[in-house]
A protein has these predicted regions:
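Bacterial N-terminal signal peptides
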Residues: 7-17
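Membrane-embedded, hydrophobic transmembrane alpha-helices
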Residues: 10, 20-21, 137-239, 246
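Short, non-transmembrane alpha-helical segments in secretory-pathway proteins
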Residues: 52-94, 150-153
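Exposed beta-strand-loop-beta-strand "reactive/processing" segments of non-cytosolic proteins
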Residues: 78-121
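Extended, hydrophilic extramembrane loops/domains of integral membrane proteins
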Residues: 108-144, 319-322, 327
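Membrane-interface transmembrane helices that cradle and orient dolichyl/undecaprenyl
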Residues: 166-175, 372-373, 401, 408-420
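Primarily membrane-embedded glycan-assembly and transfer machineries that use lipid-linked glycans
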Residues: 184-191, 195-235, 246, 250-412, ...
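Transmembrane helices and adjacent periplasmic/lumenal helix-loop junctions
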Residues: 423-447, 467, 560-568
Length: 587
């Protein structure tokens, strides 16, 4: 009887275990686990005491050894790890709530080289990130994270690109440099296509040729002039009507994506709120660290909101204070109007600021066009801005990247005034530091370095700079505030790592991935030299030379950047358009 009772008890234990188990895991699991036992997870075809008693309520079904081996066997991971020495360091942790394993892989100086998720139920690798994708979520190919899903769709992007090309091409001279210039501008779209697929080692190099070409082309125009003036192939009213339609379309797309604000626009709202509360933005961004959590969990199940020093529950953006003061002051009117809840929500103030400065660029280009070429040029410039897909890309991301070009375009409109030029360069430079490189060029326009003009330019630059930097006076100590400002802005920008240009790929220490740090250093020195040369050559400059050389300096800055983004294309676009469309002898 005892034997029958034991057998019955054993059956009651084994049958539910076998019946509740999932199908067998993939056959690619390694043959042995750390204990030397068979490692195939318990399934319907598996009948053993080990399978019956291995699952613990709330515990994992798979062993760490099995999970790591499955992850390393993933083709994408295996291909990347082939670039490193064998036997990397690994770790796998199990999350009871999600029933998933997080696997991490390290290799020597390269640090963490792979990251992923493995489902405990069936051993499936649900996420696998390698190289740049480990530290940078924006490198993982999430279409629509920037610019929105509609704009990034091929059936919107390609027609918009075609409208830009057809609208500005000179049909009388199709086979010309002018046509090539327009095609090169649009070629950034090829790089973006790979970026949206998470292929950073293809997308980043593909952005270099158009930047380099446009740099050489605009520098040539600035130093040597242009052979002919391109002619518009369409009636002015047609371009104006299309421009108005596209302008309305981009605003509509922006408003239809209420949560399409990336961290850049969010930072502007936070900074403006801090200023209105009597604090400088620097060193006062919302952080996570060990502060008490508050708010709801995000898509990954993590709670990112924290109770900050001001007692509010705010969404973290710890590195949001890396921009110049003007990048935050520009958001003050919208924050005063719409306020801020403390959360990374719809952020209407960010939408309003992005749309507002986009409209200021368009209006500024119209004014510049009317001054230097009449209504046809005004319409062509406005059309070029609204039809170019990457300007919509920036405004739909609700960034601060239209602020700098808006200020510079209006400064260009008043270029005959040294006070206006000095003010514009200062305000633009304290938004994005790239604009400070334009100071020598704009100082010496139009007839070289002249004492009276230089004094007026310098005085305006100084007054505007002091007015913007006055936000540092909101801190208890001006010295400490200035030190924090330099550390959080220039200090961070000069030391940051990034995979979004080829120059910093040496950080991965991967076989076949070049270390181009020396090339970047040469480029940076060359750009600084260019910023000085254009101040002296040519000695006499007209509007065409000023526009083209401004574009060349900004392009050089972007070409040498460690962290480059498609959002930066609007910085130089107005001056590229002016260089291509302004009359040769504009006055």
């Amino acid at each position: 009887m005892r034997r029958w009772a034991c057998a019955l008890a054993l059956a009651l234990v084994l049958v539910p275990s076998a019946g509740a188990a999932d199908p067998p895991a993939p056959s690619s699991f390694p043959p042995e686990n750390v204990h030397g036992d068979a490692t195939r997870p318990c399934g319907r075809s598996t009948f053993s005491l080990a399978c019956a008693f291995s699952p613990v309520v709330g515990g994992p079904r798979l062993t760490e050894h099995v999970v790591v081996a499955r992850f390393l066997d993933e083709p994408e991971v295996a291909r990347w790890l082939d670039r490193y020495p064998r036997r990397p360091s690994t770790d796998a942790t199990f999350d009871k709530a999600t029933r998933r394993w997080t696997v991490r892989v390290w290799s020597g100086k390269a640090g963490e080289v792979a990251l992923g998720k493995v489902e405990d139920g069936d051993g499936r690798v649900s996420e696998a990130w390698t190289g740049p994708q480990v530290a940078w979520k924006m490198a993982r190919g999430r279409v629509g994270s920037f610019g929105g899903t509609v704009l990034n769709a091929w059936w919107v992007w390609i027609p918009l690109s075609a409208v830009f090309l057809v609208g500005l091409v000179d049909r009388r001279r199709l086979w010309s440099l002018h046509t090539l210039d327009l095609l090169v501008l649009l070629s950034f779209g090829l790089s973006l296509w790979f970026f949206n697929r998470g292929e950073i080692f293809r997308s980043a190099p593909l952005a270099v040729p158009p930047l380099a070409y446009l740099l050489v082309r605009t520098a040539w125009i600035g130093f040597r002039g242009r052979a002919v003036n391109p002619a518009l192939s369409w009636p002015v009213w047609v371009l104006a009507a299309v421009a108005m339609f596209l302008g309305g379309l981009r605003i509509g797309l922006n408003l239809e994506s209420p949560r399409g604000v990336i961290d850049v626009g969010y930072a502007g709202v936070i900074g403006a709120d801090r200023i209105l509360d009597g604090q400088a933005p620097y060193g006062h961004m919302p952080v996570e660290d060990s502060r008490p959590a508050c708010g709801k969990a995000d898509a990954d199940g993590a709670i990112r909101d924290r109770i900050q020093q001001n007692g509010r529950c705010e969404s973290a953006n710890p590195r949001g204070d890396t921009y110049g003061p003007m990048a935050y002051l520009a958001y003050v009117p919208a924050v005063l109007t719409f306020g801020w809840s403390g959360k990374w929500d719809a952020l209407p103030a960010a939408h309003a600021t992005a749309i507002g400065f986009d409209l200021l660029v368009i209006l500024g280009l119209i004014m510049v066009g009317r001054r230097f070429g009449g209504t046809p040029l005004a319409v062509a410039l406005a059309f070029g801005w609204v039809a170019f897909p990457f300007t919509a890309y920036a405004v739909n991301s609700n960034t601060n990247d239209a602020i700098m070009p808006a200020i510079l375009v209006w400064g260009f409109w008043l270029a005959t005034s040294p006070v206006a030029r000095g003010t514009a360069v200062a305000l633009a430079g304290w938004t994005k530091f790239a604009a400070l490189l334009l100071a020598p060029l704009w100082l010496t326009y139009p007839n070289g370095l002249q004492r009276r003009t230089a004094v007026r330019f310098a005085a305006a630059f100084t007054v505007a700079s002091l007015a913007v930097l006055a936000v540092l006076l909101l801190e208890p100590s001006l010295v400490a505030g200035a030190r924090t400002f330099l550390d959080r802005t220039l200090g961070f920008q000069l030391e940051r790592d990034s995979p979004f240009s080829p120059w910093d790929w040496g950080q991965y220490h991967a076989r076949g991935i070049p270390d181009l740090a020396a090339v970047q250093l040469i480029l940076q020195v060359a750009v600084l030299a260019l910023a000085g040369v254009v101040a002296a050559i040519p000695r006499r400059k007209g509007p065409l030379e000023l526009a083209a050389l401004s574009a060349a300096v900004l392009l050089g800055f972007e070409l040498a950047l460690t962290h480059w983004s498609y959002l930066y294309i609007p910085w130089f676009l107005p001056f590229v358009l002016l260089g291509l469309l302004l009359p040769r002898r504009a006055t």
